[in-house]
Amino acid sequence: MFYYEIIITAHALAPLTYSCKRELEPFSEVLVEVGNKQKKGYVYKQVDKPSFKCKEILSQTDFYLTATQIQLLEFISSYYSSELGVAAGLFEPFCESKNILDTSEFGGDFSTLPELSELQNKALDFSLKNDVSLIFGDTGSGKSEIYISAIAKTLKAGKQALLLMPEIALTPQMQKRLEKYFSQGVGLWHSKIAKGKKERILKDFMSGKIRLIAGARSALFLPFTNLGLIIVDEEHDESYKNASKPCYNARDLAIWLAKNSKKSRIPSKKELSAENSRIPSGLDYDFEGIRTILGSATPSVVSYHKIPHFRLKGTFFTSSKEFLFDHSPLGLSNMIISHLAAVLEAKKQAVIFLPTRGNFKVLLCKDCGKSFSCPFCAVNMSLHKNANALKCHYCGFSSPLPSSCEHCGGSVLQSQKIGTSELKLMLESALPKAKIAKFDRDEITTAKKLETLLKDFNDGKIDILVGTQMLSKGHDYHNVELAVILGLDEHLAHADFRASEKTLALAMQIAGRAGRASHGKVIIQTAQQEFFESYLSDFELFIKDELELREPLYPPFARLSRILISHANEQKAARITEQILAQLKSIENLEIIGHGKASIAYIASKFRYYILLRAHSHSPLLKAGNIALAYGATTDIDPFNFN
């Protein structure tokens, strides 16, 4: 009899010991009984016969984790302080299909690859000679053509490639564009793909018919057996960060894989039998291990500082762009209405943006548009109506609601909410002849709806699109002459040290939707005109100025971690928080910079408390995460969300 520790998939349980009459391969999938229910699990390791009686493994499936998946599983569990079973749940959607040995040859001939400019070729060469690189390329500078060329070289080397994109950018048009160069060897992978279609994609992927996957962050967990390239497009995008446990960032996982792939474990017997490691001779580059390329027109401050980058300036668009500023309060001003009317008269189109996450909980001055900052943290404080106070969610400092602006002495206004539905009604009243549609997650619930709406817009059946951050993604609106951006002051005033970075990147992305084929106009409704005028044409200047402001307290110069405690009993949640805090105080080089009730103190019938930590290396945060894990708390390393 053999004995094994089994990782129970998608459960917070520690590995449990089971017996089996035959020898099993590590990380093969099995069915076991937990309580009186059947559960899936992975063989973790063989152990000696335990002193207690244990259940027998019910059966073994044909599924197993690949070397890349095992690397990811163990790293995610360790780095993000997650139970192995919870981390293993990330791979669970791919367990339904059998693992088919990858023995077929990929049929692409790459005869229609795009021709690169001299600068694009330099960027390609730079990227393929570094394990990890960043292409910092202006909108329209030709990043996509570089991606396609890098993918082609990887596939020619007999390897697999993964193109990660924000989910909303993964349109049928994107698939057709990739298939233009790589025939049918492309699989699109995101949450709106039907289960049956996913199973067909997996079958073709595992047989080798598909070697290129274009997908959202979950595609990183597919069973790659010979991955050679990961491209992370729009690497700054928050959608790469998982909001629930384990709180991983797919971009950071892609970077880690590239840096550690050459140190990977010995492949399993099944992987070796597939003979996937054959690499043709006469290649331009060393394709051992995994290479990761990040790309963005507005890269994150952290990536710019830490990753070798190639600056790809210029644009292939033969167009010009004019920026206009509207100082009116949030809403449709006469200026905006008149410009929209002119666009419609010229048979052109417009897009109007409203922020999704403008939580409208920040006090803004009506006269100068500035918000109220914490005197100890240099971040904006949030409005708490019930307490009639402003509060910092970093350190817990609070102050009574002011009666005047600390900057100019003017009156203080509470932000008022305007959503896409209200905005659409206002537009229909002001422009009754216009054909107006909403473009947000409430409206776009399926891939088919997205495809239909984009087609209708590009066919001229819609005059004005009113949307949220979905509008900012890389859709090609060829007849858009005007982009209107509302609500950025609320976005800029978020209680987040990244508020300026996120807001400017968003403004530049939305502005990029206008004037792609001709002259375009961008109207930004803001009281912070000076900020936008300083940086809209030079994001790199903003990054350099922002780095000076952040040193030494914020990333990339320091590391942050947020521990979230939630419990149905508020007293129990508060007590667990105090117990964790007491243990954290013994960790050297760890700073507790804030704790208390979370800004959203009650979600899903559970009370929420937080602890915010800072360190200048990962080790203290890892120790803190292990303490939190023992109490069942969630640790968010490198947090994006402070609610």
Which residue ranges define each predicted feature?
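Accessory, non-ATPase domains that flank or precede helicase/AAA+ motor cores in DNA-metabolism machines
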Residues: M1-S264, K270, F287-F317, E345, ...
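Inter-lobe coupling/hinge segments of SF2-like helicase ATPases
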Residues: I135-L155, K159-R211, A216-N260, D286-K572, ...
